[in-house]
């Protein structure tokens, strides 16, 4: 995620802009539309308890992850709920031959004339059409569920959304590129002090004690989430030749294109190029898979990726949100339909993009967070950058709910979801012969490790003790409402995110950001999974409970802070803190721990 970039990662934060109300017009009552009934999810609490059990190394059920199809079966609606909704539709005169039940998605779809749908949903509910985009939606959007089915149904929405408008690219965060002062000399990693100017792959391996890889288990490619920012293979070849000569020329990610996205081309910000250059030298000879998604100017993130790796998500809880997610076909772009369940997800996925929580709806965040839980239940490790603007989030602070004249801290999603591992950033300082890893602090680029507390997601049990210990000893005593003390706390860990060697457009520069740290940590986990698979074990899966139970596998980061919103932010301190999480990994100890687990 970026922020400072000496090129870097994009903190993908876009703000969705509402279309003028005058562009929305009522649809004719005779037009037939497709509607969707989203069932209640009574097993969500049960699913979370199951995840906490099978990811707890002290549990007898540790590692008993489910197949994705088993997860889908777990969430299907009850037979009684299905029968009640079908009876409601039949009583309303709906032709049941038009009904399609997506059990794994907990959604039932049906066709109805607009006039009849309005009567079914109650007075004042209309189907609206947007002349500019071709989209359809129900208004009011917060209409009530009919009383006959309110105990079984979460909400009812449209199952179709047309779009013919042309998308326009915009970026909320602009990267900064730092060039190295000439003449640039490749540092010799036998002494880390030689690495202070530019951290090459060899320097990074030396810092964390990572040996070169020698083996590659089958079906263990590391996943990278790509987001409309292509890379040039020529840059990779030059980077391998200069900084990772053990990687052969021509080595590049396996591309899984989603909804027509292009993976190779002229970079926009260089984010995906950075992800590849940070991860490949650690995972090689394992491979890297790029799940390439198109840029989304409507403000949402990653739903198209989740659709592509889990068909049930396409319609889960009413499907993707047309207010935030693209709809197909796109004028001048991908003609659709949107991909559903086309690819198998990798054991590890690294995500260097994020969005301010406050720019998304609560439903959007909760729906997607449930899907990250489903992937965790199936044994997938998801690593997400925590952000590069300290407690600010990406673009701006939010408003204090207790005092509108004061600001409040912001968090980034999806790192604020408790079912992913959020990664912060550090830098290395040298005092004489001493190497000291501290929280990144770069006022020049306004780059500070993203951290704090979610305003949308509750604090999970696995981190409550660590958070309570931190606040008991380091309470910043900010005004009430400055941060959500009961929210999911981030980050979980932190790694080097400053002055990393980066090559783009044939030029070696330095880069940074939590988007540099995240693929590094993901690559470490992928390496460890490789050893587990070769030993006949399963991938390690959801990491967070293990990490919080084993502070001995981390270097505790106790110096630094993450200012923002006209405050000093939080301070790094002993134990977990909302700047560096549990600290930076001691790879040999982390490897020994994770390989030893059943």
Describe each PLM feature range.
Residues 101-104:
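Short, glycine-/polar-rich solvent-exposed loops and beta-turns at beta-strand/coil boundaries
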Residues 387, 513, 581:
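Active-site glycine-centered loops adjacent to acidic/histidine catalytic or metal-binding residues
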Residues 436-439, 501, 529:
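Membrane-proximal ectodomain caps of single-pass cell-surface receptors
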Residues 431, 467-470, 478-480, 525, ...:
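An often Trp-containing, charged/polar helix-loop segment at the C-terminal end
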Residues 491, 512-530:
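C-terminal substrate/ligand-recognition segments
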Residues 19-99, 109, 114-392, 396-423, ...:
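Substrate-binding/charge-relay-adjacent region of secreted/lumenal peptidase catalytic domains
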Residues 418, 422-466:
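Polar, glycine-rich mid-to-C-terminal structural blocks
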Residues 1-20, 279:
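Fungal secretory targeting signals
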